[in-house]
UniProtKB/Swiss-Prot annotation:
PANTHER family: MITOCHONDRIAL METAL TRANSPORTER 1-RELATED (PTHR43840:SF15). This is Uncharacterized transporter MJ0449. Belongs to the cation diffusion facilitator (CDF) transporter (TC 2.A.4) family. It holds the Pfam family Cation_efflux. SUPFAM superfamilies: Cation efflux protein cytoplasmic domain-like, Cation efflux protein transmembrane domain-like. It is a multi-pass membrane protein. Its main location: membrane. The lineage of its organism: Archaea, Methanobacteriati, Methanobacteriota, Methanomada group, Methanococci.
Amino acid sequence: MREVEKPLILSIVGNILLGLIKIIIGYVYSSISLISDGIHSLSDVITSIIGIIGVKIASKPPDESHPYGHSRFECLFSFFIGLALFFTAYEIGKFAVERIIYGEVIEVNAIMVGVAILSIVVKELMTRYSLFVGKKLNSQVLIADAYHHRSDALSSVVVLVGLLLQKFGIYYGDAIAGIIVALMIAKVAFDICLTNIDYLTGRAPPKKFFELIEKEALNVDKVIGVHDIKAHYVGPRIHVELHVEVPSNISAKEMHDIEVAVKNRLESLENVERAYVHVDIVD
């Protein structure tokens, strides 16, 4: 099993277990909020499966139909996870508004509160693990899935607050908290979607990246100038094209060696997948 798949498998198993526990306890004690939160957890299994499919497709080597590889697929699937987060925000907000309109009175006990706390703790641990591995491997799917876990933890916080407020006779505080959390989740969803739209559409990296490329190329022996640097995202990785200037008194072999040296130096940089180097002779 590849390292990037482990957190996604953990997501599936964790969400199934948490979802079933919350649904069962919610059904036994007639808690609509716990049942809804449980269904929310089970729905996350779908996004984790989407993530696994995306990672598997993205890891395929280049072929005739995709000569630059399949890394954009990872961003496409991450975008879908962002859309799922938007839907989650909508559902939580809708649930909160309905609670304000209709109200809900149930008998709250320690088991219900304990399940909500368990969900918060487990989901936060899953968030930190997925985020750690995602940043380590620069996997947009894992990073998106991590923030999805965080949204689940926040929705469980809403449930916990709602249960506690209900316990003490305050029936609308939890709904206000739910609306706030829904807006927070929507913001995360927006960031995920925007980031991956940039990756999918081949957006150029920041200006400081181009400065780094020029600096690294000039550090190669006999490179006396650099111009026409172009770079764009191919999925979460970067492809670079540039012209390097060399003196006219060098041999063809030296020109080739310089081209290879610049290419290898640039491709050793973080997130640079490919570098295309053109060697220009200057008098």
